[in-house]
């Protein structure tokens, strides 16, 4: 690790995009970072992060990222509101789960890498982009969505460095 990529810009940014899809515009970001890897710390970045987001209606969502998960590519998002719960869960090769006094969750590891997890999503995104181009319509997500995700990443970086929530309202 020679240069910090900043976990919030290179990993969490995708979760910010998904959270905005679920929650709408975010008005507050509170982030925490920690290090298990000394090289990443020395480069000025975190290798693990927790981010709490709040929208204008007061709905709160939590994102947890870690550059290395021994169980595979672990990514979850859950938003609970008065009318229900929306989840984005891990994709597994099997639905068999094991739970006992020592172990819980899936009997098999999670998919190993984001390219495995999102292969279909990337293909569908490219198809939708080409379709929008051919039809002369505005693609989604838009450049405005990308800018908002980056704005959240910058707010999370500031929050993790200062230890304080950042207001975006």
Q: PLM features: residue spans?
A:
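Rossmann-like dinucleotide-binding domain that binds NAD(P)(H)
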Residues: 1-60, 66-71, 144
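A structural signal for well-ordered alpha-helical segments within the folded catalytic domains
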Residues: 13-20, 120-127, 144-151
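Structural signal for well-ordered, non-membrane alpha-helices
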Residues: 20, 27, 87, 130, ...
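C-terminal glycine/acidic-rich active-site capping loop/insertion
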Residues: 50, 76-144
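Short, ordered coil/turn segments that flank beta-strands lining enzyme active or ligand-binding pockets
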Residues: 56, 82, 161
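Short, mixed charged/polar active-site loops
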Residues: 58-60, 85, 165
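Glycine-rich Rossmann NAD(P)(H)-binding loop
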Residues: 64-68, 78-82, 169
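C-terminal helix-rich "cap/oligomerization" subdomain common to oxidoreductases
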Residues: 128-169
């Amino acid at each position: 690790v020679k240069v910090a990529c900043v976990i919030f810009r290179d990993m969490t940014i995708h979760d910010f995009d998904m959270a905005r899809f679920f929650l709408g515009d975010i008005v507050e970001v509170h982030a925490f970072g920690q290090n298990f890897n000394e090289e990443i710390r020395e480069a000025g970045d975190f290798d693990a992060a927790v981010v709490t987001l709040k929208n204008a209606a007061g709905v709160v969502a939590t994102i947890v990222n870690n550059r290395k998960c021994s169980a595979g590519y672990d990514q979850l998002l859950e938003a609970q509101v008065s009318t229900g719960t929306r989840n984005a869960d891990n994709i597994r090769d099997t639905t068999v789960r094991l739970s006992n006094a020592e172990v819980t969750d899936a009997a098999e590891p999670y998919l190993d890498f984001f390219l495995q997890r999102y292969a279909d999503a990337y293909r569908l995104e490219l198809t939708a982009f080409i379709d929008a181009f051919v039809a002369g319509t505005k693609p989604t997500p838009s450049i405005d969505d990308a800018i908002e995700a980056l704005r959240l990443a910058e707010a999370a970086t500031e929050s993790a460095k200062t230890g304080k929530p950042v207001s975006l309202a």
